[in-house]
Amino acid sequence: MKVLWVALVVALLAGCQADMEGELGSEEPLPPEQPRGQDSQPWEQVLGRLWDYLRWVQTLSDQVQEELLNTQVIQELTVLMEETMKEVKAYREELEGQLAPMAQETQARVSKELQAAQARLGSDMEDLRNRLAQYRSEVQAMLGQSTEELRARMASHLRKLRKRLLRDADDLKKRLAVYQAGASEGAERSVSAIRERLRPLVEQGQSRAATLSTQAAQPLLDRAEAWRQKLHGRLEEVGVRAQDRLDKMRQQLEEVRAKVEEQGSQIRLQAEAFQARLRSWFEPLVGDMQRQWAGLVEKVQLALHLSPTSPPSENH
């Protein structure tokens, strides 16, 4: 689930950044891309594809940039975040209801740990959405400048943006690691507390107490397994929806690429036709001017040859 979220967010970043670098010049080279191997994490591979996409977007025209400059990506991310948080909240409430037979102290501790994990997950996703909006706002502010100034600033901004993306990805990786460790630690503490409370009943040596503890523990294990399977199914459902949306966005980007290529071909054909038209206009004019100049030179040379070379003699 965590790796899927990272891949989703980085791919969405690529969609948001597509409206940034339409008219970049070639004054300064982009930072070198780090090598990506088959053993790298999925989110690292997606981040590499993002940088490849940024390089491709440099060739887009202003019109295509304006078409891509909208809030659809952030809205899609917001809807997916809200759906996921609803699923997590529903599961937490159901789990708290199932924990009612437990001791009050154990129930309060488990509920508190579940709420903390939910809050951390919501905070991480909200932070990612805020970063997307921040990147988009910065680029919108830069697009109001002149073309030459925008070219100069965007070359430097790309390098800084790559560093920020790498830093954000590393920060998200650390947050997910902390969240996973915290969830594992909380679950281990809960199981340990339940085990400690059940151990005195088992150690009493009375057959009736052992039977009762076994009968009480088995339904709890069955319900825990049912919860695990239900949560696994919900997470798979969320993952499928996220993958479908990624596929849809990838298809839209392919359509934009095809549209850009088609427009580029039309522009080239129009430029060639205009060049041929200019040539047909100016070539006769240049030829006529050359002929007139040659005639003028010839007349001047003839006039020079016909002029007298000595003064007339005086009459005595």
Swiss-Prot record:
The modification Methionine sulfoxide is found at M142. Heparin binds at L161, R162, K163, R164, R228, Q229, K230, L231, H232, G233, R234, L235. Residues 265-316 are annotated as: Homooligomerization. It is found in: Secreted; Secreted, Extracellular space; Secreted, Extracellular space, Extracellular matrix; Extracellular vesicle. InterPro entries: ApoA_E, Apolipoprotein_A1/A4/E. Residues 277-289 are annotated as: Specificity for association with VLDL. The modification Phosphoserine is found at S146. Homotetramer. May interact with ABCA1; functionally associated with ABCA1 in the biogenesis of HDLs. May interact with APP/A4 amyloid-beta peptide; the interaction is extremely stable in vitro but its physiological significance is unclear. May interact with MAPT. May interact with MAP2. In the cerebrospinal fluid, interacts with secreted SORL1. Interacts with PMEL; this allows the loading of PMEL luminal fragment on ILVs to induce fibril nucleation. APOE is an apolipoprotein, a protein associating with lipid particles, that mainly functions in lipoprotein-mediated lipid transport between organs via the plasma and interstitial fluids. APOE is a core component of plasma lipoproteins and is involved in their production, conversion and clearance. Apolipoproteins are amphipathic molecules that interact both with lipids of the lipoprotein particle core and the aqueous environment of the plasma. One of its GO terms (biological process) is phospholipid efflux. Residues 157-167 are annotated as: LDL and other lipoprotein receptors binding. The keyword Ribosomal protein does not apply. Residues 209-289 are annotated as: Lipid-binding and lipoprotein association. The keyword rRNA-binding does not apply. Residues 79-254 are annotated as: 8 X 22 AA approximate tandem repeats. GO terms for cellular component: chylomicron; extracellular exosome; extracellular matrix; extracellular space; high-density lipoprotein particle; intermediate-density lipoprotein particle; low-density lipoprotein particle; multivesicular body, internal vesicle. This is Apolipoprotein E. Sequence repeats lie at residues 79-100, 101-122, 123-144, 145-166, 167-188, 189-210, 211-232, 233-254. The gene is APOE. APOE exists as multiple glycosylated and sialylated glycoforms within cells and in plasma. The extent of glycosylation and sialylation are tissue and context specific. Glycated in plasma VLDL. Glycans are attached at T211. Belongs to the apolipoprotein A1/A4/E family. Keywords: Chylomicron, Endosome, Extracellular matrix, Glycoprotein, HDL, Heparin-binding, Lipid transport, Lipid-binding, Oxidation, Phosphoprotein, Repeat, Secreted, Signal, Transport, VLDL. Residues 1-18 form the signal peptide. Gene3D superfamilies: Apolipoprotein. It comes from Capra hircus aegagrus (Wild goat).
